[in-house]
A protein has these predicted regions:
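Short acidic-aromatic active-site loops that bind/stabilize oxyanions
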Residues: 47-58, 145-149, 225-229, 253, ...
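Short beta-strand to alpha-helix junction loop
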Residues: 203, 228-232
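Active-site phosphate-binding/coordination module
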Residues: 54, 66-153
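Short, acidic/turn-prone active-site loops that include or flank metal/cofactor-
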Residues: 32-33, 38, 102-109, 279-281, ...
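Nucleotide/phosphate-binding loop and acidic/charged catalytic motifs
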Residues: 188-194
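Active-site core segments that coordinate phosphate-bearing ligands/cofactors
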Residues: 6-7, 118-143, 150-187, 198-209, ...
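Short, glycine/acidic-enriched loop or turn micro-motifs at the edges of active sites
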Residues: 12, 24, 109, 256, ...
Length: 496
C-alpha cells in the first residue's frame, strides 16, 4: 500500500497542494497557484466586500493538485483538505452554488443598518445576547471567539436582514465545499471548521441551537457536524479523472487551517507553544480541557482537546503595512515604483543593522486593532532625530509584533494552561525574517525551532487523511511521528 498522502489547502491568496511520504517523513512535492477566482468589483472592494467564484477556486485547486501528482508520479492512499475557516457559500438542493462566496475578509456585516447608527453585527450581538467588556469585541457565550464580520453566521444574518436569503438553501465554507465536490455529497463540517461559523458551542462540541434560533436563522442552513479525521466519502470518477488517480480514493473530512498547521508543525503537544506568522499571526498551545479564554480564542482541536490561541492582532500584514508605506513614499517622492517583494528583504537587512531594542524606539503594531482592543491604533514612540530611520522603525515594529505574540502566551499561562518548554515557528513571516525570529526568542525566553516542512497546514491535512485511512491511531500520534523535530538549518538568533 502506498504511504503517500495528498492534501489541498484552499487559501485566499494561494491554493496549495502537497504530497507527503510516511516512510521517509518527507514532503515528496508541493505546488501552489495564485487564487485568481475573486470576482469583487473595484467599487465593492471600497465598501468592504470580498466575493469569489468558489467553483472556479475548486477547479484551480484540482488543476494544481493534478499537476503536482503528474510531476511527482505520486500515488496517494487518501486525500485531505484544509483552508480558510470562515466565509460563506450558499448551495441549493442540488448542491449548485447560489450567489458568490463571501470570504472571511468580507465586512458587509459591519455596514450600518439603514437609517441607524449601529451595524448589522451590533444588531446580531444584541439579538443573540452577547456580552462584552468595555472596549472589547462582543462574544456569544461558549463560542470560543469574539463575534466578527467574516464568520458564516454574520453573513447569513446580513442576507436574511436584507431579504437576500433564498429558501431551500444551505451554507458551507470553502474547504468543505471542495470536499463536497471531490466526493459528490452534501458538505459536512468538523468541529475545527465549525468554530468559524461563530455559533458553535465549543464545550459541548455542538451547534449552539438556542443561539441560532434567537438569531432567527434556520437550522437547515448549517451543515451536519462530523468528527475530524473521518472519511467524507470516496473520490468520484469525474474527479479521479481530473486528478489522474483511481476512482474511489478515500477523501477525509476537511479541518481548519490553523489546527492543521499545528498538527503539521508540533510533535510534542503538551510541551510546545506554536507561533505562526503568515498573512495573519497566531500563538497557540494545546490543552486537554476547556479553560476560560480571556482575550484569547478557544478553538476545538482535531479529534480531541483545544488550542488556546492569540489570533489576529499581528502578522504578515502588519509588516506589509510598513513595507507599503515605504513603497508608496518612494513612488510619491522619486516617481519610482520599487520592487515591493525586494523591499521586504531590504527592510529586514536594515533592521538587522540596528541594535536589539531599536535604541529605545518602541512600536505598538496594532494597525487594525486586536480582538481584545478593537479600537487600538498603531504608534511609534521614543523617536529621536537619529532614530527616525527605516531600520529603526522596522526593528521596532518586528519587536513589537513579538511582544504581542508573547503576550498571548503569557495570557494563556495566566488563564491556567501552564508554561511550555519548547517554541516552534511556522509560516514565511518567521522563516524569511531573522530579525523577527530573534525577537521571538527574546520575548518567549526560549530557542525557536522552525519546522522542517513547508506548507504546514497542508502537511497537517495530509496527516488527517493518514489518520482517517488508518495509518495512525490519532492525529497526536501522526504529529509525533511526522512533524518537525530540530530543523536541519537552525534558526539564527545572532542578529545584532
Amino acid at each position: 500500500m502506498s504511504t503517500h498522502y495528498l492534501a489541498l489547502d484552499i487559501g485566499s491568496t494561494t491554493v496549495v497542494s502537497i504530497v507527503i511520504d510516511l516512510d521517509t517523513n518527507a514532503v515528496v512535492g508541493a505546488a501552489s497557484a495564485a487564487n485568481s477566482s475573486e470576482t469583487t468589483s473595484a467599487t465593492d472592494k471600497l465598501i468592504g466586500r470580498s466575493e469569489w467564484d468558489l467553483d472556479a477556486m475548486t477547479e484551480l485547486a484540482i488543476e494544481n493538485a493534478a499537476a503536482l501528482l503528474s510531476r511527482t508520479n505520486a500515488r496517494p492512499s487518501a486525500i485531505g483538505v484544509t483552508g480558510q475557516q470562515q466565509g460563506l457559500q450558499l448551495l441549493d438542493a442540488a448542491l449548485n452554488t447560489v450567489g458568490p462566496y463571501f470570504s472571511w475578509q468580507d465586512q458587509r456585516a459591519q455596514d450600518p443598518l439603514p437609517g441607524q447608527q449601529h451595524t448589522y453585527l451590533d444588531a446580531m450581538a444584541q439579538r443573540g445576547g452577547s456580552t462584552a467588556t468595555e472596549g472589547e469585541m462582543p462574544a456569544f457565550a461558549n463560542t470560543g471567539c469574539p463575534l466578527v464580520a467574516g464568520h458564516a453566521a454574520p453573513h447569513l444574518f446580513w442576507l436574511q436582514a436584507n431579504n437576500q436569503l433564498p429558501s431551500a438553501v444551505s451554507g458551507t465554507t470553502a474547504p468543505e465545499f471542495v470536499v463536497s465536490r471531490l466526493v459528490g455529497k452534501r458538505p459536512v463540517v468538523d468541529p475545527t471548521d465549525a468554530l468559524g461559523w461563530g455559533v458553535y458551542d465549543v464545550p459541548k462540541r455542538a451547534w449552539a441551537d438556542e443561539l441560532i434560533a434567537d438569531l432567527g436563522l434556520d437550522q437547515s442552513l448549517f451543515p451536519e457536524l462530523v468528527e475530524s479525521c473521518t472519511m467524507a466519502g470516496p473520490l468520484t470518477a469525474a474527479m479521479a479523472q481530473k486528478l489522474g488517480v483511481p476512482a474511489g480514493l478515500p477523501v477525509a473530512v476537511a479541518s481548519g487551517d490553523h489546527q492543521c498547521s499545528f498538527a503539521g508543525t508540533v510533535a510534542d503537544y503538551a510541551n510546545t507553544v506554536a507561533v505562526n506568522v503568515g498573512t495573519g499571526g497566531q500563538a497557540a498551545l494545546y490543552i486537554e480541557a476547556p479553560l476560560p479564554r480571556g482575550s484569547l480564542e478557544l478553538r476545538p482541536y482535531i479529534q480531541r482537546g483545544y488550542l488556546l490561541a492569540g489570533v489576529g492582532a499581528v502578522g504578515g500584514r502588519t509588516f506589509r503595512t510598513l513595507r507599503d508605506f515605504f513603497a508608496d513614499a518612494i513612488h510619491a517622492l522619486a516617481d519610482v515604483q520599487p520592487d515591493r517583494e525586494a523591499l521586504y528583504e531590504r527592510l529586514v537587512a536594515l533592521a538587522a543593522d540596528v541594535p536589539v531594542g531599536a535604541e529605545g524606539v518602541r512600536a505598538d503594531p496594532l494597525f487594525s486593532g486586536s480582538r481584545s482592543r478593537p479600537r487600538a491604533k498603531a504608534a511609534f514612540r521614543e523617536l529621536t532625530a537619529a532614530t527616525l530611520t527605516a531600520g529603526h522603525l522596522t526593528r521596532a515594529l518586528l519587536e513589537g509584533m513579538a511582544v504581542e505574540l508573547a503576550d498571548s502566551y503569557r495570557e494563556a499561562i495566566r488563564l491556567g494552561s501552564g508554561a511550555r518548554s519548547k517554541l516552534v515557528g511556522a509560516g514565511n513571516g518567521i522563516k524569511l525574517n531573522p530579525v523577527l525570529r530573534a525577537a521571538l526568542e527574546a520575548e518567549f525566553a526560549m530557542p525557536l525551532h522552525v519546522g522542517s516542512h513547508g506548507e504546514e497546514a497542508a502537511v497537517g491535512a495530509a496527516l488527517c487523511a493518514a489518520v482517517a485511512d488508518g495509518a495512525f491511531g490519532s492525529i497526536a500520534e501522526a504529529s509525533a511521528a511526522f512533524a518537525s523535530g530540530p530543523p536541519s538549518t537552525s534558526a539564527v538568533s545572532s542578529v545584532k
